[in-house]
From Swiss-Prot:
Lineage: Bacteria, Pseudomonadati, Pseudomonadota, Betaproteobacteria, Burkholderiales
Source organism (scientific name): Burkholderia orbicola (strain AU 1054)
EC number in record: 6.1.1.7
Protein name, per record: Alanine--tRNA ligase
InterPro entries with a match to the protein in the record: aa-tRNA-synth_II/BPL/LPL, Ala-tRNA-lgiase_IIc, Ala-tRNA-ligase_IIc_anticod-bd, Ala-tRNA-synth_IIc_core, Ala-tRNA-synth_IIc_N, Ala-tRNA_ligase, Ala_tRNA_ligase_euk/bac, DHHA1_dom
Subcellular location: Cytoplasm
């Protein structure tokens, strides 16, 4: 039974038992930055189990894409070395939310395994928590499993309820016993049953875990029964497939064998048992699905984990002899295997391929040099009888050549060595400290504040009359008084000043009363709900307890709001034009522009830019109102509000409806889309692999930009004696004229060079049977120099020639050597002899080479030395 059929039978079985088939959630958990990746089927149902996310069903079943690489759950270092560890795997699960409990969960599992999958009953063993008599009795008395194959597992992890068979969501909250089902591969395989000293062997393999959420644990450790008891089960598809296909390694199942064969094809390796092929086959699944879910290779967080996995796969390909990009070629094979079950993979095939290719090409630029350094260092350690690689060197490989630590550790492991990780960590810490010392960090960092939070009025007001000073800071320390001329941070109890957040810059403005004036240059958060006003006291003395009028720079705020609102419209438009894979990766919104970074792996075309501009400007013309609502996070997301992956939102969120856009946002915005005025994209470019950046302007800035552009068009039209509407046609005509003139000029140069070549041939000097010529060819370009050298070689038959030309203070050099002389005189060496004397360098083939220089004054002397240089070699 193939993996695809196993997956399908699982889902259909539970659908027949009243379960709703729920699509796999993203590998990037929504609204939970504490979890690096989705690593089990229950992640998407966490809030359902907690009772905060009601669903229209009480039974669900899923085939959940999962990743265990990075963060608390990390199997990456074991991938390729064991039979059952994967960076990516599929978790089959069925769930009950206050519906059925132990009886049905156990009976469903037994029926599926023994009736649908037809596993022999005598091959199945089960474990239960030692105190879970109910589950024990169901297995023994109702299902009929012999008691010798039912094993009670106690608290085997050093504390009460700390057991392999007792599950907890955390220190407090839902928890309960679980029962696990094992498959016995038979006495020919080493290992003992669960709970025995030999349980880590491969004979008894866990295939399914049924968790019974039965209790709620409070902070004191007290257990009370939940009013609604639930079930969460998980069974690894790969493990189940190995059992059903009668193999002992997950890498021997059909799905992996097809990917391993594909990896062998692109790496040109015939040994299908090679561990590197297993790594590559596993990693193409993890990398592809992470990219499908919006993760892009980067230097931090999830992006860095993806980069580590890609580079680990590349290193294994390099180990197999690949010196160029190969990994991305496996995406099509993965789509063939899993595209039907996961249509989102097929839809994103080209994007995934492009992102992986770009990341590969980037790493292949440095891997060879880095590997040579690493191999040399390991050889040196081995020669000294050592077993540990210097952590400083590992850090150099990380910092200079892009080698993640686990990649270096992987190579060491293959040689029976380890990395000095504490020394690596020390080197990393030193670099971070140096970066911190060199950088200019905001003064709010490290400020100690324990007072009340600031009440923000900036959504409705631009000024607040009775703002009380509750804290003052100078040079990072709390003070009671600030004097004129001092820079300080002021914390108020109430303020209209927006603190930098969500990409929007902080407000500027003034804090003042009759005797005092404090100019606010920036506004930043001291803590989550505490706002710091950074600036300079221009007049008077400011004390804690003083009352001030706080007034923002209204014009600057208005321009910033226009840009922020335009960013929302642009984000939506980009998704419409480029696709739903577009996700915000960063932004900066200030009074001058909006800068927006997003996931997309190709430059935008002119047409795509125009379409985005048109969509946004149509929304502006519609003059739709901006509607702000505060609601529960889950309600907002269900209502279509766009939330940014990786951001942590509170239970209550602020939702902005602006035209066709709906996003979670705490920033300030225009009242109507028409307030934006005009939207214009002025810059589009790449900032990293798979990340594009757009800069745009709005309002009066956009009007000025268009007017200035119009003026330049008129100037260009006048210079070409054309109307602005005829400019494109006129430029094309001029380009044709230039092309024609360049062709004529080239012909004249060739003719001149030919005639000069005849004259130059007469200047050649014979040295040991070889004609040597070094001369300047006035007015020649590189092409003409090359053609002339070829003609002279034909004419002189046996020759070593250097020709030079000077234009605009730069020297061009071409050297040519006939085949009979090139064994002793190399054109590359000859041209470099001259180039080094004129401030340049070059290279090429033994028979033809070129170079350049920047010191034409030295050229005559350099050419004069050619004859002697050739004589020495002949």
């Amino acid at each position: 039974m193939k993996a695809a059929e196993i997956r399908e039978k699982f889902l259909k079985f539970f659908e027949s038992k009243g379960h709703t088939i729920v699509r796999s959630s993203s590998l990037v958990p929504g609204n939970d930055p504490t979890l690096m990746f989705t690593n089990s089927g229950m992640v998407q149902f966490k809030d359902v189990f907690l009772g905060t996310d009601p669903r229209p069903y009480s039974r669900a079943t899923t085939a959940q894409r999962s990743v265990r690489a990075g963060g608390k759950h990390n199997d990456l270092e074991n991938v390729g070395y064991t039979a059952r560890h994967h960076a990516f795997f599929e978790m089959l699960g069925n769930f009950s939310f206050g519906d059925y409990f132990k009886h049905d969960a156990i009976k469903f599992a037994w029926e599926l395994l023994t009736t649908v999958y037809q596993l022999p009953k005598d091959k199945l063993w089960v474990t239960v928590y030692q105190e879970d008599d109910e589950a024990y009795d169901i297995w023994a008395k109702e299902v009929g499993v012999p008691t010798e194959r039912i094993i009670r597992i106690g608290d085997n992890k050093g504390a009460r309820y700390a057991s392999d068979n007792f599950w907890t969501m955390g220190d407090t909250g839902p928890c309960g016993p679980c029962t696990e089902i094992f498959y016995d591969h038979g006495p020919d395989v080493w290992g003992g049953p669960p709970g025995s000293p030999e349980e880590d062997g491969d004979r008894y393999i866990e295939i399914w875990n049924l968790v019974f959420m039965q209790f709620n644990r409070d902070a004191q450790g007290n257990m009370t029964r939940l009013p609604k008891q639930s079930v969460d089960t998980g069974m690894g598809l790969e493990r189940l497939a190995a059992v059903l296909q009668h193999v002992h390694s997950n890498y021997e199942i059909d799905l992996f064998q097809n990917l391993i064969k594909a990896a062998a094809r692109v790496t040109e390796i015939s040994d299908l048992t090679n561990n590197s092929l297993k790594v590559i086959a596993d990693h193409i699944r993890a990398c592809s699905f992470l990219i499908v879910d919006g993760v892009i290779p980067g230097n931090e967080g999830r992006g860095y984990v993806l980069r580590r996995i890609v580079r680990r796969a590349i290193r294994h390909g390099y180990k197999l002899g690949r010196k160029g990009a190969f990994f991305h070629k496996l995406v099509a094979d993965l789509v063939a295997e899993m595209g039907t079950a996961y249509p989102e993979l097929k839809e994103a095939e080209q994007r995934v391929t492009d992102v992986l290719r770009q990341e590969e090409e980037r790493f292949f630029e440095t891997i060879e040099h880095g590997m040579s350094i690493l191999e040399a260092a390991l050889a040196e350690v081995e020669a000294k009888g050592g077993k540990v690689l210097d952590g400083e060197l590992a850090f150099k490989l990380h910092d200079t050549y892009g080698f993640p630590l686990d990649l270096t550790a992987d190579v060491c492991r293959e040689r029976g060595m380890t990395v000095d990780e504490p020394a690596f960590d020390d080197a990393m810490a030193r670099q971070r400290e140096q970066a911190r010392a060199a950088g200019k960090f905001k003064a709010t960092q490290g400020l100690e504040y324990s007072g009340a939070k600031t009440t923000f009025h900036g959504y409705e007001e631009i000024a607040f009359d009775d703002a009380k000073v509750v804290a003052l800071y100078v040079d990072g320390s709390a003070v009671n008084e600030v004097k004129a001329g001092q820079d300080a941070v002021v914390v108020l109890d109430h303020t209209p000043f927006y603190a930098e957040s969500g990409g929007q810059v902080g407000d500027q403005g003034v804090l003042a009363n009759a005797a005092t004036r404090f100019a606010v240059a920036d506004t930043l958060k001291v803590q989550a709900d505490v706002i710091g006003h950074h600036g300079t006291l221009e007049q008077g003395t400011l004390k804690v307890g003083d009352v001030l009028r706080a007034e923002i720079d209204a014009q600057r705020r208005a321009r910033t709001q226009r840009n922020h609102s335009a960013t929302h419209l642009m984000h939506k438009a980009l998704r419409e034009v480029l696709g739903a894979h577009v996700q915000q990766k960063g932004s900066l919104v200030d009074a001058d522009k909006t800068r927006f970074d997003f996931a997309h792996n190709a430059p935008m075309t002119d047409d795509e830019i125009r379409r985005v501009e048109q969509i946004v400007n149509n929304e502006i013309l519609a003059n739709a109102p901006g509607i702000v609502r505060v609601m529960p996070y889950d309600e907002a997301v269900k209502g279509g509000a766009m939330a940014l992956f990786g951001e942590k939102y509170g239970d209550e969120v602020r939702v902005l409806d602006l035209g066709f856009s709906r996003e979670l946002c705490g920033g300030t915005h225009v009242h109507r889309t028409g307030d934006i005025g005009l939207f214009k994209i002025v810059v589009e470019g790449g900032v990293a692999a798979g990340i594009r950046r757009v800069e745009a302007i709005t309002g009066d800035n956009a009007v000025r930009y268009v007017q200035e552009l119009d003026a330049r068009v008129n100037e260009a039209a006048a210079a070409l004696k054309a109307q602005p509407s005829e400019l494109t046609q006129r430029i094309a005509q001029v380009q044709e004229q230039v092309k024609s003139l360049e062709k004529e000029l080239g012909a004249l140069k060739s003719k001149l060079a030919s005639s000069q070549g005849d004259e130059l041939a007469q200047q050649a000097v014979e040295v040991a049977g070889v004609y040597v010529l070094a001369a300047t060819l006035d007015g020649a370009d590189a092409k003409t120099l090359r053609e002339t050298v070829d003609k002279l070689k034909d004419k002189l038959k046996s020759a070593a020639i250097v020709l030079a030309a000077v234009e605009g203070g730069k020297v061009s050099l071409i050297a040519g050597v006939t085949p009979d002389a090139s064994k002793k005189v190399k054109a590359g060496e000859l041209v470099n002899f001259v180039a080094q004397q004129v401030g340049g360098k070059g290279g090429g083939r033994p028979d033809m080479a070129q170079a350049g220089g920047t010191e034409p004054a030295n050229l005559p002397g350099a050419l004069a030395g050619v004859k002697g240089w050739v004589e020495e070699r002949l």
